[in-house]
């Protein structure tokens, strides 16, 4: 295999595997938030605010994977 092919394959795997965890995490966060709002509708604002903050933290991992993939493609 050529070096370019290996570089693109590594970048694709880095992004793909780096997005699996955040995707599962966001799904679990959404599920938990909906259950909590269903049990206590009065606390909707607080739950929603905390959920948005935690989703941002979870998605930051996917953004790091994207940056690593871009570095693998253009720098390595």
From Swiss-Prot:
The chain crosses the membrane at residues 8-28, 55-75. One of its GO terms (molecular function) is lipid binding. It is found in: Cell membrane. It is a multi-pass membrane protein. It holds the Pfam family ATP-synt_C. The keyword Protease does not apply. GO terms for cellular component: plasma membrane; proton-transporting ATP synthase complex; proton-transporting two-sector ATPase complex, proton-transporting domain. The record marks 59 as: Reversibly protonated during proton transport. Coiled coil: none annotated. F-type ATPases have 2 components, F(1) - the catalytic core - and F(0) - the membrane proton channel. F(1) has five subunits: alpha(3), beta(3), gamma(1), delta(1), epsilon(1). F(0) has three main subunits: a(1), b(2) and c(10-14). The alpha and beta chains form an alternating ring which encloses part of the gamma chain. F(1) is attached to F(0) by a central stalk formed by the gamma and epsilon chains, while a peripheral stalk is formed by the delta and b chains. Belongs to the ATPase C chain family. This is ATP synthase subunit c. The gene is atpE.
């Amino acid at each position: 295999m050529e070096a370019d092919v290996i570089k693109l394959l590594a970048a694709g795997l880095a992004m793909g595997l780096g997005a699996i965890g955040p995707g599962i995490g966001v799904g679990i966060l959404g599920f938990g938030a909906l259950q909590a709002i269903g049990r206590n509708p009065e606390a909707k604002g607080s739950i929603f605010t905390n959920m948005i903050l935690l989703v941002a933290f979870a998605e930051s991992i996917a953004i790091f994977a994207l940056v690593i993939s871009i570095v693998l493609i253009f720098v390595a």
